[in-house]
């Protein structure tokens, strides 16, 4: 019997373009040096990591149906597939320079994510001996919501996964702590590499 998989709470998100991947042979996903190379990049291979995200929620995933009643045989509905998943997060007390940078990612085509959980794992897609980001669509980063003295100020971030996104989903346990050992996006805003790497001209 196979042991159950604990996906855990998503605590940070790494954004990159689809096509950037880790390979067991050349740049293992479990090694900090492999990630450091992607984080240091100044071109379309760059990866950037958010600070902590909170209140992760997922909606959707229900079946798409047609018919029922007199429209279909025996009144039984037809299942046409599944709805996409919409995931949302609260970005609490973020400097708005980071929010502004995340909004630039809304313009980038073919974007994907690696999700870092509370158990030190990396949630991603596996194809043979390669590990790839999960493709996302419809990234949205909202403006600041001031909450006064009642609760922390926050921005909202949302994106969608396509149907069947989780068919090849795995949790990888690396030899380092993704949430603690990988530099956040603000470092790459400050050194100028974010602006170089996430220039929409790469995607035209």
Regions found by a protein language model. Give the residues of each.
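A structural detector for beta-sheet-dominated domains
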Residues: 16, 40-41, 50-52, 90-92, ...
């Amino acid at each position: 019997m196979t042991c159950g998989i604990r996906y855990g709470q998503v605590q940070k998100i790494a954004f990159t373009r689809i096509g950037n991947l880790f390979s067991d042979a050349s740049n293992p996903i479990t090694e900090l040096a492999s990630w450091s190379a992607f984080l240091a990049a100044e071109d379309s291979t760059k990866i950037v990591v958010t600070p902590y995200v909170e209140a992760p929620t997922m909606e959707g995933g229900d079946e798409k149906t047609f018919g029922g009643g007199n429209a279909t045989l025996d009144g039984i509905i037809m299942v046409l597939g599944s709805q996409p998943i919409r995931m949302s997060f609260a970005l609490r007390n973020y400097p708005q320079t980071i929010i502004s940078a995340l909004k630039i990612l809304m313009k980038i085509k073919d974007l994907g994510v690696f999700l870092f959980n509370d158990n030190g794992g990396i949630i991603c897609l596996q194809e043979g001996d390669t590990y790839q980001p999960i493709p996302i669509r419809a990234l949205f980063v909202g403006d600041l919501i001031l909450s006064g003295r009642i609760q922390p100020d926050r921005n909202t971030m949302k994106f969608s996964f396509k149907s069947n996104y989780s068919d090849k989903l795995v949790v990888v346990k690396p030899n380092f702590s993704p949430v603690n050992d990988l530099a956040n996006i603000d470092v790459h805003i400050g050194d100028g590499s974010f602006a170089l790497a996430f220039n929409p001209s790469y995607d035209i």
